[in-house]
């Protein structure tokens, strides 16, 4: 048997990069309403570690779960999927 754990990853959009080495990522998921059956978009914000401060607000990123790095930060930047266009 393998002792390797499955690493959780999330894809979302960066909504804040104001903190040093930390980004806030908004992750959207669709859930079905228990009574009406309509699909609703729910948003969860997670703080992720960005060692080189390379991500800007509006970028689409993939983050992976890691050991707790602070009180609120348990995710780290895995890769940048899409850069936001600079206007």
UniProtKB/Swiss-Prot annotation:
InterPro entries attached to this UniProt entry: NA-bd_OB-fold, Ribosomal_uS17, Ribosomal_uS17_bact/chlr, Ribosomal_uS17_CS
Entry keywords, A to Z: Ribonucleoprotein, Ribosomal protein, RNA-binding, rRNA-binding
Pfam families for the chain: Ribosomal_S17
One GO term of the biological process aspect: translation
Signal peptide as annotated in the record: none
Lineage per the UniProt record: Bacteria, Pseudomonadati, Pseudomonadota, Gammaproteobacteria, Alteromonadales
Free-text function comment from the UniProt entry: One of the primary rRNA binding proteins, it binds specifically to the 5'-end of 16S ribosomal RNA.
Protein's recorded name: Small ribosomal subunit protein uS17
Gene designation: rpsQ
NCBIfam families: PRK05610.1 (NF004123), uS17_bact (TIGR03635)
UniProt entry tagged with the keyword ATP-binding: no
Quaternary organization: Part of the 30S ribosomal subunit.
Example GO molecular function: rRNA binding
Positions in coiled-coil regions: none
